[in-house]
Amino acid sequence: MAEFEGGELHYRGKVGTGFDAATAGELLARLEPLREGATAPEGVPREIMREMNWVRPLLSARIHYANRTADNALRHGVFRGLRDVGLSTPVSSTRKRLIAEADLATIWVTNPTRRLFGKTGPTKLDIAVYYALVGDFMLPHILGRPVSLVRCPTGLPKDCFFQRHAFTGMPPSVVTFEATNSEGETKSYLSVEGAKGYLALAQFGVVEFHTWGTHRASLDRPDQIVLDLDPGEGIAWREVVEAAVHIKDELGRLGLVPFAKTSGGSGIHITVPVTGKQNWKKLHQATSAIATHLATTAPDTFTTTMGKDNRKKRIFIDYHRNARGHTSAAPYSLRARTNLPASTPVSWSDLESIDAPQDLNYSSLPGLLATSGDPWAEIDEFARDLPTLRSSS
C-alpha cells in the first residue's frame, strides 16, 4: 500500500487480510493492466522491493488499521474494499460527437512520458488522452467562451502559470479577441472555437481550463453565475455537501435552477444558468445580494466575508467570480495537483453519494462519462431571470 504525501507516493506497508480467494482474483484482474509504466513509491524497504510487482496508482482502497509504526506503515491493516466512484445519470441517446476520428489523429505531444507532479504522477500523454476522451462532454461548456489556461510545461507545480492572452504557436482554432476587464482596461483574451485547437493545447502543457460566465459573441450579457463553496478549516466534505444541498433548496425558492460540480479540491461549485438580461455590474450586484441572503439562512454555516480568519468552521460563499473578466474552473477541467482530480458536474443525487471527490480524476472520469453521460447536457434550457434582492454590500 502507498499514500500520497507532499505530492509523492510513500510506502505504507502490506495488507494481507480482509479478502478471500474470489476477491483476490477480482483485484488481480483490476491490477494486472496497471503494471505497465509503474514505479515504486518512496520509502520501500530493500527486502520488499525484490518481491513486489508495482502498479500505477489509479485505484484507492479502504483500509482499516490499528495504528502506525514509527516509519508510518499501517499496523494490522484490513482490506475493506476499493473506493470506487460511480455516477448514475443515464446516457443520453442524443450525445453529439464534437471530436471526429480525424481530430483524434492530429493529437501529437513531445515528451509524452514526462511525469507531472512527482515521480509517480500522470504523464503528459495521459492528459492529452483524457481531454480527447471527455471532449464530447466538455466542449459544449467551453466553446465560444473566453478562457484562461493553466499551463505546466515542466510538470513541476512551481512552474505552472495562468495563460490569459495569446502565446507563440497557438493552435488556429484558439482565437484572440480584445475586451475590457473589470477595471476597464482593454486586454486580449482567448477563446477555444474548435475541437482541433482544444486537443492541440495538450502539447503546450495545458492542464486546466477556466471560463468566463458568458460567450465571446455576447460578452456583456453573462449567461450563468457561479457560487463557489470554499470550506474553511475544520469543515469536512460531508458538511460541504449538506451545505450545497441547503443552497440548492434556497435557490429553488428564488425561482432558480442550480447545478452542482465538484471543484476538483475540497469545495463545490454551484452553477446557475440565467437568461443574460443583465450586464456584468448588475449581475455582480445580484449575486452579492443572493450570497448575502443565503448566508443569513444559516449564519453558523456560511460567511460571505473574505479572509481565512472569517471562515474557520464555516463555508465561504465566493460570489466574486461573477465579475467581468473573472473565471471559474470549466466543467471537466483537470486541476493541477496530485492525481489530477477533475472539476466534475454531477447530479444532486450523485453529489450526496460521493465520499471522495478526488477520485473523480483523469483516470476514472472518462469511463464513468461513457456510461453515465453529462448531467449538465441540458443546462442552458433551465436559464431563469435573476431575482431582485437588496444587497447589504
Predicted regions and their residues:
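Short beta-strand
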Residues: 150-152, 258-264, 305-309
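Active-site palm subdomain of RNA-directed nucleic acid polymerases
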Residues: 248-262
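Histidine-centered divalent-metal-coordination microenvironment in nucleic-acid enzymes
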Residues: 224-226, 258-279, 314-320
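Nucleic-acid 5′ end/cap handling module spanning
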Residues: 1-33, 73, 77-82, 238, ...
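Basic, low-complexity intrinsically disordered segments
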Residues: 148, 153-225, 231
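Extended, loop-rich substrate-binding clefts of extracytoplasmic carbohydrate-active enzymes
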Residues: 239-250
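C-terminal accessory nucleic-acid interaction domains of nucleic acid-metabolism proteins
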Residues: 10, 35-36, 46-129, 139, ...
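Conserved, mostly hydrophobic/aromatic
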Residues: 1, 131, 227
